[in-house]
């Protein structure tokens, strides 16, 4: 196992959750969410995050249906990942993200009740869960 840093994204049409993680520890932490306008992020905000954290790899969550089929948002998330690669030249991996938002809400609620369930917090923790699940899958 290497010590690469990895940035995870929870794609959404209004907000994109972001987390940063380390392969060596297999852990991640949520960062601030990036606002999106109909799924289009402020690319300058993403550029700033990439320059600040210098990730070696990017992981984008794929919102699949429960039966594993794709939906419109899945196609848009894949397109977002492809654009990340095209704009910034970083390797992009995709990870099934079914139920991560539900898990993120439960985790935040346990910590702070309803007040902890701010949208940006949920998106960041969702990105954290996507990233940690990807690392677990890679290195078990």
Swiss-Prot record:
InterPro entries: RNaseH-like_sf, YqgF, YqgF/RNaseH-like_dom, YqgF/RNaseH-like_dom_sf. One of its GO terms (molecular function) is nuclease activity. GO terms for cellular component: cytosol. Keywords: Cytoplasm, Hydrolase, Nuclease, Ribosome biogenesis. Gene3D superfamilies: YqgF/RNase H-like domain (3.30.420.140). It is found in: Cytoplasm. Its EC number is 3.1.-.-. GO terms for biological process: rRNA 5'-end processing. Belongs to the YqgF nuclease family. Could be a nuclease involved in processing of the 5'-end of pre-16S rRNA. HAMAP family: Nuclease_YqgF. This is Putative pre-16S rRNA nuclease. It comes from Aeromonas hydrophila subsp. hydrophila (strain ATCC 7966 / DSM 30187 / BCRC 13018 / CCUG 14551 / JCM 1027 / KCTC 2358 / NCIMB 9240 / NCTC 8049). The lineage of its organism: Bacteria, Pseudomonadati, Pseudomonadota, Gammaproteobacteria, Aeromonadales.
């Amino acid at each position: 196992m290497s010590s690469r840093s990895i940035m995870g994204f929870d794609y959404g049409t209004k907000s994109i959750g972001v987390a940063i993680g380390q392969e060596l520890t297999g852990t991640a932490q949520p960062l601030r969410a990036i606002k999106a306008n109909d799924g289009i992020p402020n690319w300058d905000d993403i550029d700033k995050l990439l320059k600040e954290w210098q990730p070696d790899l990017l992981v984008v969550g794929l919102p699949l249906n429960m039966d594993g089929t794709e939906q419109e948002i899945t196609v848009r998330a894949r397109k977002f990942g492809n654009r990340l690669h095209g704009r910034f030249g970083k390797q992009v991996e995709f990870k099934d993200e079914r139920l991560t938002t539900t898990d993120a809400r439960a985790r935040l609620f346990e910590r702070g009740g309803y007040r902890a369930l701010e949208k940006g917090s949920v998106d960041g923790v969702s990105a954290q869960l996507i990233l940690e699940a990807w690392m677990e899958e890679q290195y078990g």
